């Protein structure tokens, strides 16, 4: 039987632990376990939302689904601004391997140098970073084909402006977030923008979408904006102004074309301009919509309102005489002068035709200042045009209670107040019809568009633009008889020997008034000029009103008859042909006075009563007509492929001078 083996008892087991030590160890373990339980409870309760959000950030993402921004269209449906599909390229910078050779190809496709790309990926402590926004789809597909870990893309839209600088001041532009910054894009931001949708998705480590979490919230697209603009006439006006500014070495220029029947704006052109799709061309000078925001003294173009007030009062007729033979007129300590001294008495009609400051001032001072102010206020002087456009200027027209006699006199011929070109174009609507001032319109209301669309459909698909040409009722300002008389006076004024070959439009009777004013700087007039011409055609039934302004011509001439009248002729001729308006006069004509009694001085030719207002064929400088385009030429050059109205001028002298031409 084997012997039993004795084992030595471990000393540690034989030792008796002190009671306080065992209790301490138990308490320590209890506290540690309790802390773990409390922490677990805290994480499952108070910190649960935070932890879930942090976890979701690593695999969940809410993608904003952009609404398709509404289009901006002209009256015929031609697109002036639209949104095209594009992609935004982004990266999780902490997941991108900076040594990956494919980053060189990525930089090339993004139009960046590799150093700039690496700087974007390493800049700051941000994990998510946009590399480039609004990348075209073809480039985005080639980037996706690189399959670089950590690089992804989202769908978005890129704003497109097919007309470029031609309609830039009208449509404006948006920023990268599709928020309007200028023009109609800014003014109608809420209408055009719509409401974005959303999509919650799960992504993998490379940023690729695995699945959707919730139901997709669809975006609500923005509504289209339809303008009264005719893009063909807009192009013609833009090119005419641009070329005139270059030819006259001017600072800037603008033109407005209105439908004489309803006040709708057919064109609103400015130069200098900018390309809304290329932000590198943006600068303060090019951004200014001068036809609406820039103010100037209208000069002689305002004299017709003084004449209209005089005629409408019943105290004067077109044959009423005014003495301006001295060439100057003292009003207290002040003196006003005519640019050219007149040797004979002037009829009211001749006061406008010869642009006499003295005759106009005498006319105005014979009437109460309140009546004069009410006339100017009624046609919109001193009030911002309500066309829904940002920054439309109100101009300056002091209350008549503060007018001194000299101020009343100077206001009568367009000094001492300020206007915008659009205000003046709208004011001339009282002469185009029955004496009513028409509201200027730029936006075709959506309700009217729906009604017109139904009418067009009922007519079997007639041209959409035709439905918006109906005449509208305005606010009466002068009697219809006065408006008719003023049309004759405007026709005589535009047909005088100073302007016949500059403002004339072959085949059409035109009427209008030139203006030439010095600019006011620091409270004093300086030798910088604004040349203008405002007129309408055809005078048998006015269809368009065209206003032209050239700022600071620098090629030696500055009279409105020299600078602005030819631009008026070109725009008016092309617009009338585009609108298919029938000619109302022979190609070589000069108008006769309104009636035999208005002819003052030797050489008068009496006519039969039935000949009043009839056009007579007489010998005048020939005009060569090159038929203008009915639409915009497809060439992008300003000098090629664009038919134009060419007028050859012979033996012409400048129009009347200071205070108006």
Q: Model regions: which residues?
A:
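Periplasmic/cell-envelope proteins involved in peptidoglycan metabolism and beta-lactam response
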Residues: 1-279, 295, 370-382, 504, ...
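Beta-lactam-recognizing serine transpeptidase/beta-lactamase-like catalytic domain environment
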Residues: 2-6, 81, 203-216, 255-300, ...
